[in-house]
């Protein structure tokens, strides 16, 4: 068999194309060794819209194959029923969820933080003050407080934390709110970090990592 000039060109192209395909696929192999963090930013009152945001974020994190979720949290609280739904979703989620208290995790925000597998806090931030109040700021009856106390205790137990500390956050007589240092002392904070990058760095340890932001995955339908 005598090769034509076309055959020679084709034979030469095959190893070149194979090499190009290898180079293109190389980042995919490299990415397998990366620890993937998926960041959900919750910087608002806890209500049905924030409940939908967190639920959607967890779904997107799972679709992205994330190893960890970072819940970047800054809230003074909100509706107890919405907080309970978020809490339940976090406890059900199969991969580890890291709460990053990016200034405030008050009231319902404290409950949500405690539902996460680990908690990191920013300098100057606080967690606690989970007494149930109405829209005017008046303390609700003991029936409502008892429900919140039970949720705080059970959530702390589910994530391996002291339930008495969680319950103290709902004490109407002497409500507990903690700084990062105070939270570390009682096992309610793993460390102080100034950014979500520092959080990922501490959690990943020696492994390389990448942070994916939920905002980058949001479609116009998601934002409705």
Tell me what each language-model feature is.
Residues 1-4, 8:
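Short, positively charged and aromatic/hydrophobic N-terminal segments
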Residues 11-12, 147:
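Intrinsically disordered, low-complexity sequence elements enriched in Ser/Thr/Gly/Pro
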Residues 13-22:
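Sec-dependent signal peptide recognition
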Residues 21-30:
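Hydrophobic h-region of N-terminal signal peptides that target proteins for export
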Residues 30-224:
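Soluble extramembrane regions of membrane proteins in the secretory/endomembrane system
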């Amino acid at each position: 068999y005598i090769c034509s000039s076309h055959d020679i060109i084709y034979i030469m192209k095959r190893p070149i194309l194979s090499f190009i395909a290898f180079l293109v696929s190389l980042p995919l192999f490299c990415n397998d060794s990366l620890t993937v963090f998926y960041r959900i930013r919750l910087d608002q009152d806890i209500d049905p819209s924030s409940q939908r945001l967190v639920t959607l974020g967890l779904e997107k994190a799972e679709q992205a194959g994330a190893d960890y979720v970072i819940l970047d949290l800054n809230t003074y609280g909100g509706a107890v029923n919405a907080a309970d739904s978020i809490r339940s979703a976090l406890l059900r989620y199969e991969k580890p969820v890291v709460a990053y208290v990016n200034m405030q995790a008050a009231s319902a925000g404290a409950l949500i933080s405690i539902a996460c597998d680990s908690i990191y806090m920013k300098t100057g931030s606080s967690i606690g003050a989970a007494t149930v109040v109405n829209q005017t700021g008046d303390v609700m009856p003991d029936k409502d407080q008892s429900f919140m106390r039970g949720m705080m205790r059970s959530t702390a137990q589910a994530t391996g934390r002291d339930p008495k500390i969680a319950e103290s956050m709902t004490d109407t007589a002497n409500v507990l709110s903690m700084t990062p240092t105070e939270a570390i002392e009682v096992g309610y904070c793993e460390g102080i970090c100034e950014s979500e990058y520092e959080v990922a760095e501490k959690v990943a340890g020696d492994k390389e990592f990448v942070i994916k932001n939920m905002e980058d995955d949001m479609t116009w339908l998601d934002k409705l």
